[in-house]
Amino acid sequence: MSNSFVLVINSGSSSLKFAVINSVTGEAVLSGLGECFGLEDARMGWKYSGEKTEIAIEGEDNHHKIAIGKLVGLTEELGLTKDIVAVGHRIVHGGEKFTSTVRINEEVTAEIEKLADLAPLHNPAGAIGIRAAMEAFPALPQFAVFDTAFHQTMPKRAFTGAIANELYTDFGIRRYGFHGTSHYFVSREAAKMLNKPIEESSFISVHLGNGASVCAINNGESVDTSMGFTPLSGLMMGTRCGDLDPGIIEYLLKKGWSQEKVFNSLNKASGFLGVSGLTSDARGILEAMEQGHEGATLAFQVFTYRVAKYIASYLAALDSFDGIIFTGGIGENSLPIRREILKNLKLLGFVEDEKGNEDARFGNAGVIATSALLNAVAMVIPTNEEFVIAQQSVELL
């Protein structure tokens, strides 16, 4: 199995992220991105053996299908085809139907499409990617790995909304959670770092990127998470508002805002972008803070405070506590944001290891703080969702 490769596909509404992953080591032998699908400047780029290549994707439509078709030729040209044993697809929403990775057939694809109402930006695109890959690689078994699956272990007290029960029974409204593949991976890596069995370790995993979520993981299982029915709830994010009084929506509608305008604002013009009035990028926020920008400073303060609040509240969900895991683009790389979050958790007794915090960036894992009070640590673990997708696909062969 030393050369057991999996083609991992993450199909977005106007993009296609792909990688050929060694399912044993997690190494990305080939990685690339197709973007601007549906536009005149649709293109596809990839990296192989340190060299980058980019090509234009011609044609007015079917860009997902064209890009995956080009993948067939590319993997053959690079001599990878003979070692690819499966195709793994990242699918955002599995609802209650899919609680684990499944082998894809027509019935599974149709069910993913039926869940489009729960993830209108993601599931239809995922299904397009599946259908294109099934046609392009008909001899390869294909698997769907769901962002929501890891959270299906949440108890009812955690996933049930305090709303009329028929809203759950008739419409499936409940907490589902996302970033599950990331939370799953980093919790296993954290247990290894502490030399503890995953079944006997409990963490609060903090995935901070343009999208962000916190997950309470008790003995290896998700028991609560900050994202809910959709990825809009929970933490403040790059452009998403996070938790918000739902009465505000009614108020804005009464003020003459359209439903589309309200939800565009909450999804695409809030978070770092909305509070700062400047940018959705955490790096831009930090740069502007250094120059005294008030909006950026406030955005930094709101973000770090809300993350700390969630971490503290999730101690109530755990039977024991081994530590905090920071991951995602911001969590893995932003020393000032991690430092401020831990500062806001001063009553938990975390003392920063300044050198450890400096070193744990740019792909490096490490312990960044310790709490003698809780006998716990804060650590950084770079996530690798593609590796999980590859592993779980191979396990079902």
Swiss-Prot record:
Enzyme class of the recorded protein, top EC level: transferase
Cofactor note: Mg(2+). Can also accept Mn(2+).
Listed name of the protein: Acetate kinase 2
Subunit details: Homodimer.
Binding site for ATP: K17, H207, L208, G209, N210, G211, D281, A282, R283, G329, I330, G331, E332, N333
InterPro entries hit by this protein: Ac/propionate_kinase, Aliphatic_acid_kin_short-chain, Aliphatic_acid_kinase_CS, ATPase_NBD
Cofactor: Mg(2+); Mn(2+)
Site (Transition state stabilizer): H179, R240
Gene that this polypeptide is encoded by: ackA2
Catalytic residues as annotated in Swiss-Prot or TrEMBL: D147 (proton donor/acceptor)
Species this protein is from: Vibrio vulnificus (strain YJ016)
CDD domains: ASKHA_NBD_AcK_PK
Residues that coordinate or bind Mg(2+): N10, E385
